[in-house]
Protein backbone atom coordinates (compact mmCIF):
# COMPACT_ATOMS: atom_id res chain seq x y z
CA UNK A 1 0.00 0.00 0.00
CA UNK A 2 1.52 3.31 -1.09
CA UNK A 3 1.95 6.30 1.19
CA UNK A 4 0.33 9.14 -0.76
CA UNK A 5 1.28 12.78 -0.25
CA UNK A 6 -0.28 15.91 -1.73
CA UNK A 7 2.13 18.85 -1.73
CA UNK A 8 0.62 22.33 -2.01
CA UNK A 9 1.79 25.92 -1.70
CA UNK A 10 1.55 29.36 -3.23
CA UNK A 11 2.77 29.54 -6.82
CA UNK A 12 6.32 30.73 -7.40
CA UNK A 13 7.81 29.93 -3.99
CA UNK A 14 9.81 26.84 -4.97
CA UNK A 15 7.18 24.19 -4.32
CA UNK A 16 8.16 21.92 -7.21
CA UNK A 17 11.87 22.24 -6.43
CA UNK A 18 11.14 21.30 -2.83
CA UNK A 19 8.93 18.38 -3.86
CA UNK A 20 11.58 16.99 -6.21
CA UNK A 21 14.21 17.17 -3.49
CA UNK A 22 11.89 15.45 -1.01
CA UNK A 23 11.33 12.73 -3.63
CA UNK A 24 15.10 12.37 -4.02
CA UNK A 25 15.62 12.14 -0.26
CA UNK A 26 12.90 9.50 0.03
CA UNK A 27 14.42 7.44 -2.79
CA UNK A 28 17.93 7.65 -1.35
CA UNK A 29 16.52 6.40 1.96
CA UNK A 30 15.25 3.30 0.19
CA UNK A 31 11.71 4.13 -0.96
CA UNK A 32 10.35 3.42 -4.44
CA UNK A 33 8.95 6.82 -5.43
CA UNK A 34 6.55 8.23 -8.02
CA UNK A 35 6.20 12.00 -8.39
CA UNK A 36 3.12 13.30 -10.21
CA UNK A 37 3.17 16.88 -11.46
CA UNK A 38 -0.30 18.44 -11.45
CA UNK A 39 0.38 21.77 -13.13
CA UNK A 40 -0.20 22.76 -16.78
CA UNK A 41 3.43 24.00 -16.89
CA UNK A 42 4.46 20.32 -16.55
CA UNK A 43 7.82 21.26 -15.01
CA UNK A 44 7.42 19.59 -11.61
CA UNK A 45 9.65 16.64 -12.49
CA UNK A 46 12.28 18.65 -14.41
CA UNK A 47 14.86 18.43 -11.58
CA UNK A 48 14.43 14.64 -11.54
CA UNK A 49 14.60 13.93 -15.28
CA UNK A 50 16.31 17.00 -16.73
CA UNK A 51 13.57 17.21 -19.38
CA UNK A 52 10.08 18.61 -19.86
CA UNK A 53 8.44 15.26 -20.38
CA UNK A 54 5.30 14.42 -22.29
CA UNK A 55 2.12 14.83 -20.23
CA UNK A 56 -0.61 12.26 -19.67
CA UNK A 57 -3.03 14.46 -21.60
CA UNK A 58 -0.61 14.67 -24.55
CA UNK A 59 -0.15 10.90 -24.51
CA UNK A 60 -3.90 10.30 -24.37
CA UNK A 61 -4.50 12.78 -27.17
CA UNK A 62 -2.11 10.83 -29.42
CA UNK A 63 -4.31 7.72 -29.06
CA UNK A 64 -7.67 9.54 -29.17
CA UNK A 65 -8.07 8.96 -25.41
CA UNK A 66 -8.09 5.16 -25.71
CA UNK A 67 -6.44 4.35 -22.39
CA UNK A 68 -5.88 0.72 -23.32
CA UNK A 69 -3.39 1.69 -26.02
CA UNK A 70 -0.92 3.25 -23.58
CA UNK A 71 1.91 1.53 -21.73
CA UNK A 72 3.97 2.62 -18.73
CA UNK A 73 6.78 4.00 -20.89
CA UNK A 74 4.31 6.26 -22.72
CA UNK A 75 3.62 8.32 -19.60
CA UNK A 76 6.43 7.69 -17.12
CA UNK A 77 10.11 8.59 -17.24
CA UNK A 78 12.60 7.29 -14.72
CA UNK A 79 14.92 9.92 -13.31
CA UNK A 80 17.46 10.44 -10.56
CA UNK A 81 17.75 7.64 -7.96
CA UNK A 82 15.25 5.51 -9.89
CA UNK A 83 12.37 7.90 -9.21
CA UNK A 84 9.47 7.52 -11.63
CA UNK A 85 8.12 10.82 -12.92
CA UNK A 86 4.73 11.61 -14.43
CA UNK A 87 3.26 14.92 -15.57
CA UNK A 88 -0.54 15.07 -15.65
CA UNK A 89 -0.52 18.29 -17.66
CA UNK A 90 -3.63 20.37 -17.97
CA UNK A 91 -6.45 21.46 -20.25
CA UNK A 92 -5.98 24.33 -22.74
CA UNK A 93 -5.98 27.78 -21.15
CA UNK A 94 -9.49 29.02 -20.46
CA UNK A 95 -11.15 25.63 -20.78
CA UNK A 96 -11.49 22.33 -18.96
CA UNK A 97 -10.73 21.37 -15.37
CA UNK A 98 -7.42 20.54 -13.74
CA UNK A 99 -9.14 18.07 -11.44
CA UNK A 100 -10.33 16.06 -14.43
CA UNK A 101 -6.74 15.82 -15.64
CA UNK A 102 -5.53 14.55 -12.26
CA UNK A 103 -8.34 12.00 -12.23
CA UNK A 104 -7.38 10.77 -15.70
CA UNK A 105 -3.77 10.32 -14.58
CA UNK A 106 -4.77 8.29 -11.52
CA UNK A 107 -7.23 6.23 -13.59
CA UNK A 108 -4.51 5.42 -16.10
CA UNK A 109 -2.05 4.40 -13.38
CA UNK A 110 -4.68 2.08 -11.90
CA UNK A 111 -5.49 0.55 -15.30
CA UNK A 112 -1.79 -0.13 -15.89
CA UNK A 113 -1.50 -1.75 -12.46
CA UNK A 114 1.08 0.81 -11.34
CA UNK A 115 -0.69 2.68 -8.57
CA UNK A 116 0.23 0.19 -5.83
CA UNK A 117 3.79 -0.50 -7.00
CA UNK A 118 5.33 2.41 -5.10
CA UNK A 119 6.24 3.00 -1.48
CA UNK A 120 5.51 6.72 -1.79
CA UNK A 121 3.51 8.74 -4.35
CA UNK A 122 3.78 12.53 -4.29
CA UNK A 123 1.27 14.81 -6.02
CA UNK A 124 2.85 18.22 -6.69
CA UNK A 125 -0.17 20.47 -7.07
CA UNK A 126 -0.75 23.97 -8.43
CA UNK A 127 -0.76 25.73 -5.12
CA UNK A 128 -2.99 28.68 -4.41
CA UNK A 129 -5.95 27.49 -6.48
CA UNK A 130 -8.09 25.46 -4.09
CA UNK A 131 -11.09 24.96 -6.34
CA UNK A 132 -12.69 21.52 -6.38
CA UNK A 133 -10.50 20.57 -9.33
CA UNK A 134 -7.05 21.23 -7.95
CA UNK A 135 -8.04 19.95 -4.52
CA UNK A 136 -8.71 16.54 -6.14
CA UNK A 137 -5.37 15.01 -5.01
CA UNK A 138 -6.58 15.40 -1.42
CA UNK A 139 -9.15 12.71 -2.23
CA UNK A 140 -6.33 10.18 -2.64
CA UNK A 141 -3.76 11.44 -0.13
CA UNK A 142 -2.87 10.13 3.31
CA UNK A 143 -1.14 13.39 4.13
CA UNK A 144 -0.94 16.92 2.80
CA UNK A 145 2.22 19.00 3.07
CA UNK A 146 2.15 22.78 2.62
CA UNK A 147 5.20 24.65 1.31
CA UNK A 148 5.27 28.27 2.47
CA UNK A 149 7.50 31.30 2.84
CA UNK A 150 7.51 33.79 5.70
CA UNK A 151 5.22 36.41 4.13
CA UNK A 152 1.58 37.43 4.02
CA UNK A 153 0.65 36.08 0.56
CA UNK A 154 2.13 32.68 1.28
CA UNK A 155 0.49 32.42 4.70
CA UNK A 156 -2.84 33.54 3.25
CA UNK A 157 -2.58 30.75 0.64
CA UNK A 158 -1.58 28.25 3.33
CA UNK A 159 -4.65 29.15 5.36
CA UNK A 160 -6.88 28.60 2.32
CA UNK A 161 -5.23 25.23 1.85
CA UNK A 162 -5.95 24.41 5.49
CA UNK A 163 -9.61 25.15 4.75
CA UNK A 164 -9.54 22.70 1.84
CA UNK A 165 -7.85 20.00 3.92
CA UNK A 166 -10.36 20.47 6.73
CA UNK A 167 -13.25 20.17 4.26
CA UNK A 168 -11.81 17.06 2.60
CA UNK A 169 -11.08 15.37 5.93
CA UNK A 170 -14.82 15.04 6.53
CA UNK A 171 -15.10 12.48 3.73
CA UNK A 172 -11.52 11.38 3.13
CA UNK A 173 -8.58 10.20 5.26
CA UNK A 174 -6.26 13.13 4.49
CA UNK A 175 -4.53 15.01 7.32
CA UNK A 176 -1.96 17.79 7.37
CA UNK A 177 1.52 16.49 8.12
CA UNK A 178 2.89 20.00 8.51
CA UNK A 179 4.34 23.07 6.83
CA UNK A 180 7.75 23.31 5.18
CA UNK A 181 9.30 26.76 5.56
CA UNK A 182 11.03 27.48 2.25
CA UNK A 183 13.56 30.16 1.28
CA UNK A 184 14.30 30.93 4.91
CA UNK A 185 16.40 34.09 5.18
CA UNK A 186 17.06 35.23 8.74
CA UNK A 187 18.72 38.45 7.52
CA UNK A 188 16.12 39.79 5.07
CA UNK A 189 13.01 37.68 5.58
CA UNK A 190 12.65 37.46 9.34
CA UNK A 191 13.38 33.74 9.41
CA UNK A 192 10.22 31.78 10.23
CA UNK A 193 8.62 33.98 12.90
CA UNK A 194 5.25 34.46 11.18
CA UNK A 195 5.10 30.87 9.92
CA UNK A 196 5.73 29.54 13.41
CA UNK A 197 2.90 31.62 14.83
CA UNK A 198 0.55 30.63 12.00
CA UNK A 199 1.40 26.92 12.36
CA UNK A 200 0.62 27.02 16.08
CA UNK A 201 -2.71 28.77 15.50
CA UNK A 202 -3.95 26.23 12.90
CA UNK A 203 -2.75 23.25 14.94
CA UNK A 204 0.19 22.00 12.93
CA UNK A 205 4.01 22.23 12.97
CA UNK A 206 6.96 23.27 10.85
CA UNK A 207 8.42 20.10 9.36
CA UNK A 208 11.66 21.74 8.27
CA UNK A 209 13.33 25.00 7.32
CA UNK A 210 14.83 25.12 3.82
CA UNK A 211 17.41 27.92 3.53
CA UNK A 212 17.33 30.66 0.93
CA UNK A 213 20.39 29.63 -1.07
CA UNK A 214 21.67 30.32 -4.56
CA UNK A 215 22.77 26.69 -4.91
CA UNK A 216 19.15 25.50 -4.77
CA UNK A 217 18.18 27.95 -7.52
CA UNK A 218 21.11 26.81 -9.67
CA UNK A 219 20.17 23.15 -9.27
CA UNK A 220 16.65 23.88 -10.51
CA UNK A 221 17.86 25.61 -13.66
CA UNK A 222 20.35 22.80 -14.26
CA UNK A 223 17.57 20.20 -14.19
CA UNK A 224 19.07 18.50 -11.15
CA UNK A 225 18.22 17.80 -7.55
CA UNK A 226 20.38 19.24 -4.78
CA UNK A 227 21.72 15.73 -4.20
CA UNK A 228 23.42 15.87 -7.62
CA UNK A 229 25.25 19.13 -7.03
CA UNK A 230 28.94 19.36 -6.18
CA UNK A 231 29.78 18.27 -2.63
CA UNK A 232 30.59 20.88 -0.01
CA UNK A 233 29.37 22.48 3.23
CA UNK A 234 26.80 24.64 1.40
CA UNK A 235 25.29 21.54 -0.19
CA UNK A 236 25.16 19.78 3.18
CA UNK A 237 23.29 22.75 4.67
CA UNK A 238 20.72 22.65 1.85
CA UNK A 239 20.22 18.88 2.00
CA UNK A 240 19.58 18.69 5.73
CA UNK A 241 15.88 19.77 5.68
CA UNK A 242 14.99 17.48 2.76
CA UNK A 243 16.48 14.49 4.58
CA UNK A 244 14.64 15.47 7.77
CA UNK A 245 11.31 15.56 5.92
CA UNK A 246 11.96 12.18 4.30
CA UNK A 247 12.87 10.60 7.64
CA UNK A 248 9.68 11.96 9.19
CA UNK A 249 7.46 10.71 6.35
CA UNK A 250 9.03 7.24 6.39
CA UNK A 251 8.71 6.89 10.16
CA UNK A 252 6.27 4.29 11.45
CA UNK A 253 3.49 6.69 12.47
CA UNK A 254 4.07 10.25 11.20
CA UNK A 255 2.13 12.66 13.40
CA UNK A 256 -0.52 14.65 11.54
CA UNK A 257 -3.70 16.56 12.27
CA UNK A 258 -6.78 18.12 10.73
CA UNK A 259 -5.96 21.84 10.64
CA UNK A 260 -8.25 24.52 12.04
CA UNK A 261 -7.97 27.50 9.66
CA UNK A 262 -8.04 31.01 11.06
CA UNK A 263 -9.86 34.13 9.87
CA UNK A 264 -8.36 36.53 7.35
CA UNK A 265 -8.14 39.26 10.00
CA UNK A 266 -6.15 36.91 12.21
CA UNK A 267 -3.57 36.59 9.44
CA UNK A 268 -3.24 40.38 9.28
CA UNK A 269 -2.66 40.38 13.04
CA UNK A 270 0.15 37.83 12.67
CA UNK A 271 1.84 39.83 9.92
CA UNK A 272 1.24 43.19 11.60
CA UNK A 273 2.77 41.99 14.83
CA UNK A 274 6.14 41.47 13.17
CA UNK A 275 6.39 44.75 11.27
Swiss-Prot record:
Belongs to the NifH/BchL/ChlL family. The gene is bchL. Keywords: 4Fe-4S, ATP-binding, Bacteriochlorophyll biosynthesis, Chlorophyll biosynthesis, Iron, Iron-sulfur, Magnesium, Metal-binding, Nucleotide-binding, Oxidoreductase, Photosynthesis. This is Light-independent protochlorophyllide reductase iron-sulfur ATP-binding protein. It catalyses: chlorophyllide a + oxidized 2[4Fe-4S]-[ferredoxin] + 2 ADP + 2 phosphate = protochlorophyllide a + reduced 2[4Fe-4S]-[ferredoxin] + 2 ATP + 2 H2O. Its EC number is 1.3.7.7. Signal peptide: none annotated. Mg(2+) binds at residue 16.
